[in-house]
A protein has these predicted regions:
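Receiver (REC) domain active-site loop signature in two-component systems and cognate sites
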Residues: 56, 79
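Charged docking surfaces used in two-component/phosphorelay signaling
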Residues: 16-24
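Short hydrophobic/Thr-rich beta-strand motif most characteristic of the beta2 strand and flanking loop
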Residues: 26-33, 41
Length: 142
């Protein structure tokens, strides 16, 4: 499986760690340093998936996810939060339409599993009611 992933994190080391792990699995990776930069590049790079940190300058991950969901061009784009999230942030993320959560620190294999699951879910036909089920990719088995 391949695809283009937009990795958004203000920590350069974390961006590189995620990039290397995804590239080793055959994914193309584009990075952004915060939510504002993500919104600037998302239409130009047309990713298949976006990963977001929560705590970032200018525009945090939860507000970025909400903006991606409110834009018709990115409303169906899978979004995963990769962060040390509180329960409140998880609930807020689910309300904003985040598809999966991965807690920092994470195992590389878990990162790959979440990304693959979200991409498979995106390619799958919609459910009978035509909806996606947010949050399931981070917790279901595939």
């Amino acid at each position: 499986m391949s695809g283009r992933v937009l990795v958004v994190d203000d920590n350069k080391v974390i961006r590189q760690l995620i990039r290397v792990n995804l590239e080793l699995e055959g994914f193309e990776v584009v990075t952004a340093a915060d939510g504002a930069e993500c919104l600037e590049v998302v239409h130009r790079v047309s990713p298949d998936l976006v990963t977001l940190d929560v705590m970032m300058p200018r525009l945090d991950g939860l507000r970025t996810a909400a903006r991606l969901r409110s834009d018709p061009r990115t409303s169906g784009l899978p979004v995963a939060i990769i962060s040390a999230c509180t329960q409140y942030e998880v609930e807020t993320g689910l309300a904003a339409g985040v598809d999966a959560f991965l807690a920092k620190p994470f195992e590389p294999a878990e990162l790959i599993r979440v990304v693959r699951q979200l991409l498979l879910h995106r390619e799958a036909p919609p459910s009978a009611d035509g909806s996606r089920e947010p949050g399931r990719a981070g917790s279901s088995r595939g």
